A protein has these predicted regions:
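Conserved CoA-thioester-binding segment of acyl-CoA-metabolizing enzymes
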Residues: 1-50, 86
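Terminal peptide-recognition signature
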Residues: 10, 14, 28-29, 47, ...
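Catalytic-core regions built around general acid/base machinery
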Residues: 32, 80-91
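Short, Asp-centered acidic motifs that coordinate Mg2+ and/or phosphate
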Residues: 44-46, 70, 116
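Glycine- (often His-adjacent) and acidic-residue-rich active-site loop
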Residues: 49-85, 103, 131
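Crotonase-fold acyl-CoA enzyme core
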Residues: 86-179
Length: 179
């Protein structure tokens, strides 16, 4: 996290793990959103991902390594991540998601929570939950139908269709494609 000239830059920084969300990242995300929302000097927030992609969703490999099962781990992760998303949705300053590469699962939900979504031409958007045998999370089951309508949201969720940046723009999921 850095703040320059009133603009806060919050970068998901797990590039070697596709910026997937694990407990430490979820906790850091929540803490950062709380602090930035309380900072009167922040007039805008830009969300991005380090490395080759924005965010590939939850860290499923980490979930599977839990000795006592993933349930308690995931519950703690979700508590922090969802609390951060709720604050982000009502953030007192405009939120811009700068998406490149994949925005999958909860990563897609995170991007779509922003007020403005600017995507690189190489961006791809996918729900990814059904491929992993999971139900939608990360706010996607609420925000997606509100942005693009129920029929298209069901298509993306149930068929696990991947959208290009151009298709996401056509669907109304993003604001513009960066050139």
């Amino acid at each position: 996290v850095r703040v320059e000239d009133g603009v806060a830059w919050l970068t998901l920084n797990r590039p070697n793990a596709a910026n997937t969300i694990d407990r430490p990242l979820a906790a850091a995300f929540h803490k950062a959103i709380v602090e930035l929302n309380d900072d009167a000097n922040v007039r805008a927030l830009v969300l991005s991902g380090a490395g080759k992609m924005f965010c590939a969703g939850g860290d499923l490999q980490r979930f599977a390594r839990e000795e006592d099962g993933a349930s308690a781990y995931v519950e703690a992760l979700i508590a922090d991540f969802h609390a951060g998303l709720a604050l982000l949705e009502n953030f007192r300053a405009p939120v811009i998601a700068a998406v490149h590469g994949a925005a999958a699962g909860a990563g897609m939900g995170l991007a779509l929570t922003a007020d403005i979504v600017i995507a690189a031409e190489n961006s791809r958007f996918v729900m990814a939950y059904t491929r992993a045998g999971l139900t939608p999370d990360g706010g996607t089951s609420w925000i997606l139908p509100h942005l693009i309508g129920l029929r298209r949201a069901l298509e993306l969720t149930l068929l696990n269709r991947t959208l290009t940046a151009a298709e996401a723009l056509d669907f109304g999921m993003i604001t513009e494609i960066a050139t």
